[in-house]
């Protein structure tokens, strides 16, 4: 985005879906402002894995396995509570604020849930960075143990909750 040749074109909307955090913050907001028409809109889409109080949560049921196969990993831990994530319902969330380049944001939340069996949950984890970074000699036994735990202690059905968020702001003059 930072080096993209816009050929002088201007746009009514610019959308970044789970990618804005990769854009150089010293360039990104100014560049977004400059490629938008006056009054154009900037939209950031993202999501967070969340949990709800009182609902069985996979990490709580498998913390001992995580520590057995990959002890001390700083990536392990409970997802945040959905209600806590919703407190970030103003501004641009966790990315750097654009200052006066954009007006006030409109924020909308979209909760979704994905139901998985033990094998499906292990396959999902295989695609995620904290697990991909593990040595396969630790990763595969850990994921096999997680799948087995889900099958035997959680009825072979777990929820993976996501809270999608849309943050939209209009370009200022």
Per-segment meaning from a language model:
Residues 83-86, 90-173:
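Conserved Class I S-adenosyl-L-methionine
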Residues 1-2, 168:
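Portal/gating segments that form or line small-molecule/metal binding sites
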Residues 37-112:
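Conserved catalytic/acceptor-binding region of the Class I
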Residues 26-40:
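A short glycine-rich, Lys/Arg-flanked "PGG" loop and its adjoining helix->strand segment in the class I
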Residues 7, 54-58, 120:
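Short aromatic-enriched loop/helix-cap "lid" or pocket-rim segments at secondary-structure transitions
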Residues 2-14:
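A short acidic, Gly/Pro-enriched loop at the edge of an enzyme's catalytic core
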Residues 11-26, 48:
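A short SAM/SAH-binding and catalytic strip from SAM-dependent methyltransferases
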Residues 4, 22-23, 46, 69, ...:
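Tryptophan-centric aromatic hotspots in well-structured domains and transmembrane helices
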């Amino acid at each position: 985005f930072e080096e993209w040749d816009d050929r002088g074109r201007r746009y009514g909307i610019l959308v970044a879906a789970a990618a804005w955090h990769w854009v150089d913050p010293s360039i990104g907001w100014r560049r977004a402002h400059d490629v938008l028409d006056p009054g154009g809109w900037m939209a950031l889409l993202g999501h967070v894995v969340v949990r709800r109080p009182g609902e069985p949560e996979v990490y709580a049921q498998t913390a001992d396995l995580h520590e057995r196969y990959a002890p001390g990993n700083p990536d392990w831990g409970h997802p945040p509570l959905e209600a806590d994530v919703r407190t970030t319902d103003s501004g641009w969330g966790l990315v750097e604020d654009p200052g006066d380049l954009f007006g006030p944001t409109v924020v909308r939340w979209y909760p979704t849930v994905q139901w998985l069996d033990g094998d499906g949950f292990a396959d999902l984890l295989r695609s995620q960075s904290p697990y991909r970074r593990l040595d396969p000699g630790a990763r595969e036994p850990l994921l096999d143990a997680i799948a087995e735990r889900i099958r035997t202690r959680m009825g072979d059905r777990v929820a993976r909750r996501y809270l999608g968020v849309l943050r939209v702001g209009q370009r200022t003059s």
